[in-house]
From Swiss-Prot:
Similarity-based family: Belongs to the neurotoxin 06 (delta-actx) family.
Key words, A-Z: Cleavage on pair of basic residues, Disulfide bond, Ion channel impairing toxin, Knottin, Neurotoxin, Secreted, Signal, Toxin, Voltage-gated sodium channel impairing toxin
Name assigned to this protein: Delta-hexatoxin-Mg1a
SUPFAM superfamilies, per the entry: omega toxin-like (SSF57059)
Gene3D superfamilies reported in the protein's UniProt record: 4.10.40.10
Residues making up the signal peptide according to the UniProt record: 1-18
Length: 105
């Protein structure tokens, strides 16, 4: 009889202890998820800011008073062509002579 009571008490303690541990684990998991989610949001904001900065720096200037560096004709404004210079291996926007007389792009 004592053995049966001890076994029942042990079983109840194991079940109660398991539920307590499960609740603690759920709370820790929830806190961990919230912490990681907030960290992920901060990282995404930083990534967006860095990408925006890179995009701003990589844009080609158009229609400046000085020569603008270009990669293709579409990087230059109306009346300019993207001309490659062999001496510095770079292309820049230069005014078309035809535009001076006709005004067409």
């Amino acid at each position: 009889m004592k053995t049966l009571v001890i076994a029942c008490v042990a079983l109840v303690l194991v079940v109660v202890h398991g539920e307590v541990i499960e609740e603690v684990n759920e709370k820790q998991l929830q806190e961990s998820v919230e912490e990681k989610y907030s960290l992920l949001q901060r990282l995404e904001k930083l990534d967006e800011a860095i990408t925006a900065e890179e995009n701003r720096n990589s844009r080609v200037r158009r229609c400046g008073s000085k020569r603008a560096w270009c990669k293709e004709k579409k990087d230059c404004c109306c009346g300019y062509n993207c001309v490659y210079a062999w001496y510095n291996q770079q292309s820049s926007c230069e005014r078309k002579w035809k535009y001076l007389f006709t005004g067409e792009c």
